[in-house]
Structures are given as C-alpha cells and as structure tokens.
Regions:
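Terminal, non-globular segments
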Residues: 58-61, 65, 79-91, 95-96
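Residue-identity detector for threonine
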Residues: 6, 11-13, 56, 77, ...
Length: 96
C-alpha cells in the first residue's frame, strides 16, 4: 500500500536537528522524498507498523509531529502531480 508520511520536527535546538536527520534517514530507507518532510512509501502492514514505531521513538511528541496517510494499493488514481518531478515513481525499480 502507498503510505504518505509527513513530519514537522522542531529544529530550534541541536537535539531537534538531530531528530530531523534521524527521521529523514529512516524515511529514505522505506520510500522516496517527494518534498521537504514528505515521503511516499510502498509498505506492507508489517513494514508500516515497524516504521511508525521507529519514527515515534525518534520524535519528541511535545514539539514534533508525524502524519501517516494510508492511500492503499489503488493509489495511482488518488495521486495527481503537477510540475517538476525529479525522481523515479515510488513503485519503479532502480538498478545500480
């Protein structure tokens, strides 16, 4: 299923900047960045639960926030993009 993950991490402190880097790094491991602090991830249920747990452990819920939008498996008709797209589609294979 496609899961859209967005986050807002308070970066006023060094600890906040560290949390921001950690959240972004985890999201990169599971999907692709489509905008600052916005990732598209193709996940199964187990991966979704695991990533949510990892990210929740990183953030400070007093000053940071996470949002998860579960768009399901039929997401191609639910996503519209306008403008420059600088990457592969989230479901395309990249061979290195």
């Amino acid at each position: 299923m496609l899961v859209l993950i967005t986050y807002d991490v308070n970066t006023e402190t060094a600890a906040g900047r560290s949390r921001l880097r950690k959240v972004a790094k985890q999201c990169v491991n599971y999907g692709r960045r489509v905008q600052n602090s916005v990732f598209e991830c193709i996940l199964d249920n187990a991966q979704s639960v695991l990533l949510k747990s990892i990210l929740t452990d990183i953030i400070d819920e007093e000053v940071d926030s996470l949002r998860f939008y579960y768009l399901g498996n039929n997401y191609k008709t639910k996503v519209e993009h306008i403008g420059v797209d600088r990457g592969l589609a989230v479901d395309q294979t990249l061979i290195l």
